[in-house]
């Protein structure tokens, strides 16, 4: 189940992995494009052809019922809108149009309805990243996502770091850092939650057939932490950062 379907990629990948997929999105045009893309990539008669629905995910139960989708799901996997970082439409139901407090309220409703359709002893996975407000302060969106799932009774079980391509950040980051002391961000957080009994969930999955690197994972379904989080806080008005710290000067002998 994917309550924030967006584009076609997750549905197509699920089909290639022989997994039934149901994704919902508010945009009818987006869903039409998804179906056309899936037909082009997979063919209309492909087994496990993705199923996309159109509707408001804050009314997800009604959307699923209207489309004749019953029963519970083996997994939730989604990548939600990052509040108003990108506004997708002028539809008042579009949560990217809402202020942050309204966004979080609607976001939690969507997560709650999604989790109600997740089977016991199964996983929910969200790919998220933190976002800044108009003053440049982080909103703590990752933590709000964790709160939304644990508020539904799920266990926060795994956290992974998805490293994105640097692309144009290498060009932009020097001016950005000198002007605001904001570091360039090139990762997202993959948050994994477990519904039900952790022990029974572990026992319900077959072992992955990769030897030493996965011995710990097969025992507990826990990922190994290969990173530390470096959290930076600033006391005062962020507008004064450049004045307080000046520009960062790099020697010509060092890479730019």
Summary of predicted features, one role per range:
Residues 1-256:
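Class I S-adenosyl-L-methionine-dependent methyltransferase catalytic core
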């Amino acid at each position: 189940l994917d309550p924030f379907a967006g584009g076609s990629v997750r549905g197509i990948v699920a089909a290639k992995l022989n997994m039934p997929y149901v994704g919902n999105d508010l945009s009818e045009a987006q869903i039409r494009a998804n179906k056309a893309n899936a037909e082009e990539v997979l063919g209309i008669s492909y087994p496990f052809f993705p199923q996309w629905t159109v509707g408001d995910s804050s009314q997800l139960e009604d959307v699923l019922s209207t489309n004749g989708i019953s029963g519970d799901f083996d997994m939730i996997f989604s990548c939600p809108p990052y509040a108003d970082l990108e506004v997708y439409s002028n539809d008042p139901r579009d949560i990217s149009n809402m202020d942050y407090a309204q966004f979080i309220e609607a976001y939690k409703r969507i997560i709650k309805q999604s989790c109600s359709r997740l089977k016991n002893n199964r996983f929910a996975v969200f790919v998220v990243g933190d976002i800044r407000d108009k003053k440049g302060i982080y909103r703590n969106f990752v933590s709000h996502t964790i709160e939304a799932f644990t508020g539904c009774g799920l266990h926060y079980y795994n956290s992974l770091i998805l490293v994105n391509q640097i692309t144009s950040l290498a060009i932009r980051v020097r001016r950005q850092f000198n002007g605001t002391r904001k570091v360039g961000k090139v990762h997202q957080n993959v948050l994994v939650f477990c519904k039900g009994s952790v022990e029974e969930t572990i026992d319900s999955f077959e072992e992955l057939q990769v030897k030493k690197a996965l011995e710990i994972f097969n025992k507990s379904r826990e990922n190994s932490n290969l990173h530390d989080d470096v959290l930076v806080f600033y006391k005062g008005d962020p507008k004064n950062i450049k004045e307080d710290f000046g520009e960062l000067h790099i020697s010509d002998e060092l890479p730019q």
